[in-house]
Amino acid sequence: MNNTEFHELVDEKLQLIEDMIDDSGADIEPVITGNVLTLEFENRSQIVINKQEPMHEIWLASKSGGFHFSYVDEKWTCSKTGMEFIEMVKEECQKHADEEIEWA
């Protein structure tokens, strides 16, 4: 994968996260600054998601720790847990919000 393809794939996922949050009605504020998407919660906690272009990875930092995702078999998979990226984002959002979120 080249850098252009990497950015297109990651941007698609970041937009999906924003859309999912909007559709859920959860009190989460997504803020994009450069290559970083920060999800800010009512309790002032944050999830930080960023593009790591040199490694072609997505990194996610939350109160559960730091996670790296690589694009394998057409999906972003965590090197530590084997979990798919969007599923982990949903799980971490629920932990940070301290409530069940109704994902569309």
From Swiss-Prot:
InterPro entries per the UniProt record, alphabetical: CyaY, Frataxin/CyaY, Frataxin/CyaY_sf, Frataxin_CS
A cellular-component GO term for this protein: cytosol
CDD domains per UniProt: Frataxin (cd00503)
A Pfam family recorded for this sequence: Frataxin_Cyay
Coiled coil (residue ranges): none
GO annotation (BP), single: iron-sulfur cluster assembly
Keywords in alphabetical order: Iron, Metal-binding
Top-rank lineage group of the source organism: Bacteria
GO MF terms, alphabetically ordered: ferric iron binding; ferrous iron binding
PANTHER family to which the protein is assigned, alphabetical: FRATAXIN, FRATAXIN, MITOCHONDRIAL
Function according to Swiss-Prot or TrEMBL: Involved in iron-sulfur (Fe-S) cluster assembly. May act as a regulator of Fe-S biogenesis.
Similarity section: Belongs to the frataxin family.
Name listed for the protein in its UniProt record: Iron-sulfur cluster assembly protein CyaY
Gene: cyaY
